[in-house]
Design a protein with these regions (language model features):
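Short coil turns linking two alpha-helices in DNA-binding domains
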Residues: 16, 27-30, 42, 56
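Recognition helix of helix-turn-helix/homeodomain-like DNA-binding domains
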Residues: 24-40, 63-65
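Short basic helix-loop element that most often maps to the first helix and adjoining turn
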Residues: 4-19
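Alpha-helical transmission elements in cytosolic ATPase-linked domains
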Residues: 1, 33-36, 48
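DNA major-groove recognition helix of helix-turn-helix/homeodomain DNA-binding modules
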Residues: 44-59
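Alpha-helical residues within the helix-turn-helix
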Residues: 11, 22, 51
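Charged, helix-prone or intrinsically disordered regulatory segments positioned adjacent to compact structured domains
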Residues: 57-79
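Cytosolic nucleotide-binding catalytic cores of signal-transduction proteins
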Residues: 4, 22-25, 43, 47
Length: 79
């Protein structure tokens, strides 16, 4: 669930893995591993990620965060 939430938050903000990694001073592959569930950030890094996305740490670890649908996608579905 953590990996899914990280990916959803990153995409909601239009952020690439590379940009997220740069802002956290880590390599892109680390972000990828977190999102795939192959590794997990330590407690200090979880705090930094929560600060980056302006969310509580509990929301990173809690319920699944849904990705917001693209407005173009919604318009296409309504047409």
């Amino acid at each position: 669930m953590l990996g899914e939430n990280l990916k959803a938050l990153r995409k909601q903000r239009g952020m690439s893995q590379e940009v997220m990694a740069q802002q956290l001073n880590i390599v892109r592959q680390t972000v990828s591993k977190w999102e795939q569930g192959l590794s997990v950030p330590d407690a200090q890094m979880l705090t930094r990620i929560a600060e980056l996305f302006e969310v509580p740490v509990s929301s990173l670890l809690g319920e699944k965060i849904e990705e917001k649908a693209d407005t173009d996608e919604i318009a296409a579905q309504l047409a």
